[in-house]
Amino acid sequence: MVKIMSINLTAKDKMKKLAEIPVLYSDASLKKCLDLMTEKSLGITCFTDRAGKLVGLLTDGDLRRLLLNKQSPLPALLVSDGLSFGNSNPKVGHADDQISDLQNLMNEKQIWDLPIVDSSGVLLGLLHRHDANQ
């Protein structure tokens, strides 16, 4: 059996929807961030403002660096403390971007998870490298 792949797949065809990814406001606790990463089985959390606009992201590696540098108890740390170790201006894709273009961007920039936003910067979902390649 031959599998026919569409060459017109876009981010919206492959991205994880908001309900499937860790999303918090930037005033959340780091513990909540870690709990949500664990619950959603992803090594990234996206942060939005109250209007849903993407304001940054933290990876599990960013959190590790934060904990090692701050030497503060976990309950005392907020996500806003961690954004200096994370990315407050992440690369993003858009729902109608071609998967092949986003794969090239992810490969070039060595990105595993790419936030997908609308034209106003509102977070719509997340494209995981494995999902893009399937």
Predicted regions span which residues?
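A structural micro-motif recognizing beta-strand termini
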Residues: Y25-A28, A95-D97
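Short loop/turn microsegments at loop-to-beta-strand junctions
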Residues: L42-G43, I111-D113
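Acidic (E/D-rich), amphipathic helical modules within compact regulatory domains
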Residues: K32-N69
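Proline-centered helix-kink/hinge sites
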Residues: C46, P90, P115-I116
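Short, basic/aromatic recognition patches
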Residues: A28-D35, S100-N104
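Tandem CBS (Bateman) regulatory domains
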Residues: V2-E20, V55-I111, L123-Q134
